[in-house]
């Protein structure tokens, strides 16, 4: 049954204009002072979520985002800071883009965050999706297979480091430790100092393609999966595929177990008002994520139309109403959201986690109002039984 509510905040600053008639995504530029407001915005979101009993604030690691959409470069540093401002809320790494790190540096930094926050930092790994970020840090992104090979070896190393008193690794990309003399002996193994105190380390990863290779790798390391904002019907293939992988790995998972299902939402007194209020933010979401492949079902011609000011209807760009009808976005009153979530419980009896998130571009004031409203009128229907 659903019992844990979270949200995903990718780190957008408040934008002065939004929607299809507003500044095109690639033309947005902001001052350093304005980009830095992402931290005060994150603090406000964390305090609000902590007050209303949320489980986890998932933050996204991104770099070089002068457009103002994803402006948090280091989740682990921020997690330590947020732990001083909150009493219960966990900060989730959604996600540490592993190919941009040395695996042992990432393992060390997470271990420090785990200890300093008293276990309120949740580990998460991802392969990345921005060429500007991953390739700039010297890792492959355009070559998907090379990216996956590197990622899997890195995660293997991280898990060895987390869970072993000492370890060694020899692979395609890393030989750890190197064969060097050290204080009179030949180096044969390493120890992560200190290791995380919470063992085994809870780890999450996004489920995107839901390939058998990717899911089997997750199950091998007992990695849980976040399925991003999309209709349950769209996510159904991934949900069943994850359970199948768990069964192949010898785990008797119920359908939905080990997963968190994501939904974009906006509450209002009526569906019509909710749709009207969030349409500009939805359109900004399409402008940002469409070219990156995260707007399900959009065609190349529709994508081309979405890069221009206006004319989206003529170009056939999917509307918010379309995604609301299929359940990818929820727009309406709290009682209807409660009913929708209960249908998900019935369909996926192992589902405990959901992450309900505001659209890219949603102003801070609105995000705080929505999080509080959800916490008061939706979450108690699931957390107090």
Q: What do the predicted segments below correspond to?
A:
Residues 1-85, 200-201:
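N-terminal beta1-alpha1-beta2 module of alpha/beta enzyme domains
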Residues 50-51, 79-88, 110, 114-121, ...:
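Acidic (Asp/Glu)-rich catalytic clusters
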Residues 53, 61, 82, 113, ...:
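Conserved, mostly hydrophobic/aromatic
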Residues 16, 102-221, 249:
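Internal, glycine-rich beta/alpha segment that forms the wall or movable "lid"
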Residues 69-93, 150, 374-383:
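Alpha-helix-loop-beta-strand connector modules within alpha/beta enzyme cores
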Residues 5-9, 57-59, 90-93, 121-125, ...:
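Hydrophobic faces of well-ordered beta-strands that scaffold small-molecule active sites
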Residues 208-239, 243:
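A conserved active-site cap/scaffold subdomain adjacent to cofactor or substrate pockets
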Residues 3, 7-30, 145-192, 234-348, ...:
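An alpha-helical appendage that flanks or caps ligand/catalytic pockets
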